[in-house]
Amino acid sequence: VISMLQGAPVADPAASLTTDGVVPTWMTDAAERFATFERAAYSGTYPVAEIAFSDDAHPLDVRMRVLNPMVPGDVEVSSIPTGMFEFTLRNTGDYAVHGTLAGSLLNAAGWDGITPIGEHTPGLGGNVNRLRRGGGWARVVMDNPSLDESDQFAGQLVLAADDESAAVLARCAGVEHLHAFLASRALNDGRSRLATAPTIGDPQLNAPRGGSGPSAAGRTWLGVVGVPFWLEPGESRTVRFAMSWHFANRMVDVEQFGQPHPEWGASRFYLGNAYALRYPDALAVQDDVERRWNELVARTTAWTATLTRSSLSPREVDHLAAQEAYVRSPTCFVGADGRFYGHEGSLGASTWMWSGVFGGSCPLNCTHVWQYEAALAGLWPTLERNMRDTEFDIMQAPNGSIPHRLRVPVYLPQMTDELIGGPEEPALDGMLATILKSLRDMQRGAGRDWLAARWPAIVRLYRHIAEKWDADGDGVLHGIQPSTHDIDLAGVNPFMGTLWLPP
């Protein structure tokens, strides 16, 4: 019996306007080819998900726990580019069971993340997968040496399992090849020969061969790692998988606001990723994850336990845990310059807008949107202060105002003397928030030195607001007030006024 560790597809995966519910065709096709488990039950608190699989056709219960390391206050651990999976298999039958738990990963180096992957996909081709065993793990290292090192889509991925004797199909051509590999698994699989020949991917002699060399133009390889198991009745075993990645060359790939600058032509602007300065490649990420596995799991689950064991209701726990999800989604990133950057959100199949369906929406560090966000300051206050530094050092205009959008890279001219867009002039609620957030930064441990360095800029901003909207000093804001609604408010109103209320 060959089954995907996936619940049976539902008839109508409808989603709300804030969640993508589109299931890719390749996933439904694979589910039909491999079959799925009859039942799948989800539980968990972000960033930990637990799924229990069961099926009357299987004498096994399977429990999967998956997480990405996340520790409040520790930015580096919380931005390790990896996914960590633990599968616990338990024999629920009356007889011994043997099988293979396999994971597969597409070598996506060169893919733009947008073009549909088919028989011939531009960007793919020349992809290379390599086997690496050692330290109790079996790995497939994936990259594309045909790309220049500076290419936006150059990078590396690693799929690994914590069984050095796992059967590895490093270069799998597709779903049918994968199915043939899984169907060929035998109890007498020849693993003993790996002791003297560790470079063999699959030690089983009567099994499908893998591909060889770089992938053909427009094509790529899957990497497959299969861990064999034998379980007596009532016996269980836990198998760990990880997938790690490293794509250093983040570029500006969204349309920025403000006036057009045709003089920039077709220039591609580099932003990079901070994690790429800590790790030279994905194999280094994977080495770190393997070495620190127990620590990373313990520190991550300590956070979720803090929530779930509190006096909060389950609904409140879910609400609070969800707040950190967007900070660690593609909405946000830390560039190679060490600055924290955040879009207003992420685009997708159910969240499309004028700028399309891919990437981040409405760049960048929008003060009139991020002013209503609180998780960053509570969980990673250094990143919150990082945003203040950008607002004061880069975005602030000579007259003290702060445009509500950042243009990147930050060495480009900012929108201090041009129409910004959404709204056209600097958003007042965003500027008021910068002052209030500076107070919160102090309350969260920024220190007197930070305040002393920022005080002149805070005063300039305060005076700009007071002179333009509260010239009579009565503590009430007057006039046209650009806001987060991408429109201007007019006259006295509590929405904007309660952000002011000076002593």
Tell what function each PLM region has.
Residues 2-4, 14-15, 74-77, 99-102, ...:
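Short, solvent-exposed loop/turn and secondary-structure capping segments
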Residues 89-93, 97, 232-252:
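Ser/Thr/Pro-rich, low-complexity mucin-like regions
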Residues 18-82, 174-225:
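Extended, loop-rich substrate-binding clefts of extracytoplasmic carbohydrate-active enzymes
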Residues 497-503:
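Active-site neighborhood of glycoside hydrolase catalytic domains
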Residues 204-222, 228, 235, 239-240, ...:
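Substrate-binding groove/exosite segments of carbohydrate-active enzymes
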Residues 53, 64-66, 101-105, 235-247:
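Short, hydrophobic/aromatic-enriched beta-strand segments in well-ordered soluble domains
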Residues 64, 69-196, 225, 256-311:
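Polysaccharide-binding surfaces and accessory modules of carbohydrate-active proteins
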Residues 49, 83-85, 99, 239, ...:
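Residue-level detector of short, conserved catalytic/binding motifs and their immediate flanks
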